[in-house]
Amino acid sequence: DPVEGSTLASTAMIQHEIDVPLHVLARKIGAEKAARAWRRSARAVEDLRLRVERLGINCAMTAKQALYLAGNEYGSRALQTEAQTRHEAGIAADYLNAAALQDRFGLSRTGAIVSDFSASANPAQMTAGLLRAAMARGAELVSPVEVTDVEERGETVILATSEGRLLTAGHVVFCTGYEFLKVMESPVHRIISTWALASRPDMARPGWLDGFLVWEASDPYLYFRTASGGRTVSYTHLTLPTKRI
């Protein structure tokens, strides 16, 4: 159903930084394609923020910086390489060594990257606002509908529902969050656990945290940010790789 499920569980950390570091992605698909993907991601965050502002959606949308901490997946040397690769691609990123990180943020890691182009929002309010705007422009919202199977036939996508109906479309976009359809499961990875947590209101926290999204180069990993009412919202996720790509 709209504005339920994984929407309500979302931490709404809207990051331009995609899961694969730029210097790693460049080795996989080439420097030019990788840089383009990262630049488009940064532009997408800014476009979303401006769209929410233009539509007048009240969802606590706020521009944020991101603090990416060294971890067990990528250490200080990898983060130095990553920051340099981003600079070369025209994406601003500042590398902090352990001493600078401790001095500025009071955190003990071997290194970190500070970057712009991220944001946070209330996910339920933002989703509801965007859906209302879409419907005002002629989109149709149908709920509840359970899609049980998907099949591609030429230029057409066919969806089967639990009621026995078949829906056809030229394109289908799945925005299911953590709820995977069986036909979308991948041999590349398997989710072991994922948790979203929120603290009590007015939790004691450093002042700088209100302006940052914090995440780490680890597996399992932890992300966290502040939310309205003085809460701290966090997200932890563990995947089990089954096949390297």
Each PLM stretch: what is its role?
Residues 1-9:
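Glycine-rich FAD pyrophosphate-binding loop
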Residues 14-98:
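Dinucleotide-binding Rossmann-like beta1-alpha1 core, especially the glycine-rich loop
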Residues 31, 58-68, 100-129:
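Helix-loop-beta segment of a Rossmann-like dinucleotide-binding subdomain
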Residues 74-77, 104-110, 151-157:
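A short, glycine/Asx- and small/polar-enriched loop/turn
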Residues 113-156:
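Helical element adjacent to the flavin cofactor pocket in flavoenzyme catalytic cores
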Residues 149-227:
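Flavin-dependent oxidoreductases
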Residues 230-235:
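Short FAD-binding loop at a beta-strand-to-alpha-helix junction that anchors the flavin cofactor
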Residues 236-242:
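Conserved small/polar residues in nucleotide/adenosyl-binding loops
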